[in-house]
Amino acid sequence: KQAESMSAALRDEMGIAKAFMDLYSRMAADPALLASATMNLWMEQAQLWQSSWMKMLGMPAAPVAEPAKGDWRFKDEEWSKSFLFDYIKQSYLIAAKHLHATLGHVAGLDEHTARKVDFYTRQYIDALAPTNFVLTNPEVLRETIASSGQNLLKGFNNLLDDLARGGGELRVS
């Protein structure tokens, strides 16, 4: 059964790998786009670094990146109050913005492939949000300390229940 699952995963039935291979080949054909995107990312990260140092030294510093209106993931005040969590949040937002913008400006993709790349890029970006990880989420850290880790145990037990219901596979609905 495991070999069948591996084989199915390698078949790329949804054409995800093919879509990204097309994207990457078009990006390679336009090195100026890639160089410009990389330079813009570096410049914004440098601004964040400078702003973060100012904040750490107690000086006023405007945020370089802010969550989109309605983005509930960073609602906890610790995301703005804490130097470290503010830096993590803004660094993620900058990287996410640049990745999405860069991949969205690659010329020559057909509409179906462009939509597929956009969808899976958003999934990837959202999956890597610092809110999804224990050590980079102040709310989860606070609850973990307050509950002596019981929140993590409960989450792990929920995962095991989901796997059992799915016959050993995680079925997200």
Residue ranges and their predicted role:
Residues 1-173:
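Amphipathic, low-complexity, repeat-rich surface-exposed segments
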